[in-house]
C-alpha cells in the first residue's frame, strides 16, 4: 500500500509543478490567434 501512496504523491507533485510552470509562462508554441 505504501508504494501506491508514494506513487500518488509523486504524480500529484509533478502535476502541481507542471501546472505552476505552465500557467506562470504561457506556451509560446501556440500562436496568439489560436485558442
Curated annotation (Swiss-Prot):
**Gene Ontology biological-process annotations:** photosynthesis
Q: Which UniProt keywords apply?
A: Chloroplast, Membrane, Photosynthesis, Photosystem II, Plastid, Thylakoid, Transmembrane, Transmembrane helix
According to its UniProt record, where is this protein located? Answer: Plastid, Chloroplast thylakoid membrane
**One CC-aspect GO term:** photosystem II reaction center
Spans through the membrane:
3-23
Signal peptide position in this chain?
none
Identify the Pfam families for this entry: PsbT
Topology class, membrane: Single-pass membrane protein
User: Can you state the subunit structure given in the record?
Assistant: PSII is composed of 1 copy each of membrane proteins PsbA, PsbB, PsbC, PsbD, PsbE, PsbF, PsbH, PsbI, PsbJ, PsbK, PsbL, PsbM, PsbT, PsbY, PsbZ, Psb30/Ycf12, at least 3 peripheral proteins of the oxygen-evolving complex and a large number of cofactors. It forms dimeric complexes.
Report the function annotation for this chain.
Answer: Found at the monomer-monomer interface of the photosystem II (PS II) dimer, plays a role in assembly and dimerization of PSII. PSII is a light-driven water plastoquinone oxidoreductase, using light energy to abstract electrons from H(2)O, generating a proton gradient subsequently used for ATP formation.
Give the similarity note.
Belongs to the PsbT family.
Name of protein: Photosystem II reaction center protein T
Amino acid at each position: 500500500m505504501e508504494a501506491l501512496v508514494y506513487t500518488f504523491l509523486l504524480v500529484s507533485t509533478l502535476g502541481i509543478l507542471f501546472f505552476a510552470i505552465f500557467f506562470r509562462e504561457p506556451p509560446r508554441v501556440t500562436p496568439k490567434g489560436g485558442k
